[in-house]
């Protein structure tokens, strides 16, 4: 059944949304509409003496020659320093048709010093199902540079053993998509959240009543036309609907290897006091009560007053105004000369003490 949408109602609905609203297409993917990874094994030829002499490269070279009708004696060991065995991989986007081209990445598998100046000869790219979906060939673009002296010393700029061929793969087979089957389409949120899933469902139902249903924190199922052309038009309208997603969960992400710390805007602190090495952190929470006069017809209001003090061994002291956040704490610790390791240790201690309103995630 063909779906008819009132254009006037649609634009009135879109114009009434918040300035912080985001499109559905920016928050969710359509189930079944995805890319597929392809991989293949091939040879890069034409290298200026920067290739390799590994056994599997020699075997691959002999196999390639035999495919062209050239037979080499088994005991003959060819000198092929201008050849390198490589892994070739690419991504086949959804709905890519036969005859279209895709970019491919070529990486050395052996001891080749550089792939600069090389050409990938025809390589079949296969999917996880073992079927061939594309063929790759062409000259490599290598951004890296390497140089080596006779004493074994070498200098590397970027990575010379990985190259790329723009539009170097020709698609030979299309991947079938479940997009056109069934009477429903499903939106999958990129970041699972029950509230956002409910809001997405409500937004679609405000336009087409009873058509959407939130299945869980990730998926929202929508009733859709069976005809493929109607389904495309239907989806083009839905994916441009805007709504304001729920605020993300309060999280602190800490990368222990790089020292990177990312703090969500919803993270706050409870009252706590910490001493770490020469650093002392004190957080005080004081509640003030505002009591109106007896006949003022006002309301009693309780307000929170927060004070944070940070000091180190050289007696420097930092005093902050009320409204303590974790961002303020981290900035204060950095100002007294603490490194990322100190900040991470303090965050872990605060989390163990239950003083952080949020989740601490260490990666």
UniProtKB/Swiss-Prot annotation:
A cellular component term, taken from the record's GO annotations: outer membrane-bounded periplasmic space
Location(s), subcellular: Periplasm; Bacterial flagellum basal body
Gene Ontology terms describing biological process: bacterial-type flagellum-dependent cell motility
UniProt keyword terms in alphabetical order: Bacterial flagellum, Periplasm, Signal
Pfam families named among the record's database cross-references: FlgI (PF02119)
Broad class of the protein's primary localization: periplasm
Gene Ontology MF terms: structural molecule activity
Lineage: superkingdom: Bacteria
Signal peptide: 1-21
Cited InterPro entries: Flag_FlgI
PANTHER family for this protein: FLAGELLAR P-RING PERIPLASMIC PROTEIN FLGI, FLAGELLAR P-RING PROTEIN
Subunit note: The basal body constitutes a major portion of the flagellar organelle and consists of four rings (L,P,S, and M) mounted on a central rod.
Function noted in UniProt: Assembles around the rod to form the L-ring and probably protects the motor/basal body from shearing forces during rotation.
Family: Belongs to the FlgI family.
Full protein name: Flagellar P-ring protein
């Amino acid at each position: 059944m063909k779906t008819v949408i009132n254009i006037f109602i649609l634009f009135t609905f879109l114009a009434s949304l918040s300035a912080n609203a985001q499109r559905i297409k920016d928050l969710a993917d359509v189930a079944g509409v995805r890319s597929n990874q392809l991989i293949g094994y091939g040879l890069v030829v034409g290298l200026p003496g920067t290739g390799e002499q590994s056994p599997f490269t020699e075997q691959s070279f002999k196999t390639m020659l035999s495919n062209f009708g050239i037979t080499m004696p088994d005991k003959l060991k060819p000198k092929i320093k201008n050849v390198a065995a490589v892994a070739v991989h690419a991504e086949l986007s959804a709905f890519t048709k036969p005859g279209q081209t895709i970019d491919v990445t070529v990486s050395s598998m052996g001891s080749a010093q550089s792939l600069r100046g090389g050409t990938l000869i025809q390589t079949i790219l296969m999917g996880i199902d073992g079927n061939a979906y594309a063929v790759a060939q062409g000259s490599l673009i290598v951004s890296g540079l390497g140089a080596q002296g006779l004493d074994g010393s070498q200098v590397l700029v970027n990575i010379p053993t990985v190259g790329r061929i723009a539009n170097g793969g020709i698609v030979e087979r299309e991947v079938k998509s479940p997009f056109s089957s069934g009477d429903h389409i499903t939106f999958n949120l990129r970041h699972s959240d029950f509230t956002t899933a409910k809001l997405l469902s409500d937004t679609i139902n405000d336009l087409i009543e009873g058509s959407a249903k939130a299945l869980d924190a990730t998926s929202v199922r929508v009733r859709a036309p069976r005809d493929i052309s109607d389904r495309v038009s239907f989806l083009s309208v839905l994916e441009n609907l805007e709504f304001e997603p729920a605020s993300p969960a309060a999280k602190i992400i800490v990368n222990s290897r790089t020292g990177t710390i990312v703090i969500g805007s919803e993270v706050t602190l409870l009252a706590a006091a910490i001493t770490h090495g020469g650093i002392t952190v004190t957080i005080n929470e004081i509640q003030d009560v505002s009591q109106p006069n007896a006949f003022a017809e006002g309301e009693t209001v309780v307000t929170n007053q927060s004070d944070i003090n940070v000091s180190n061994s050289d007696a420097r002291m930092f005093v902050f105004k009320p409204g303590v956040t974790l961002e303020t704490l981290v900035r204060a610790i950095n100002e007294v000369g603490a490194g990322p390791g100190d900040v991470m240790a303090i965050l872990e201690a605060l989390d163990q003490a239950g003083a952080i309103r949020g989740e601490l995630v260490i990666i």
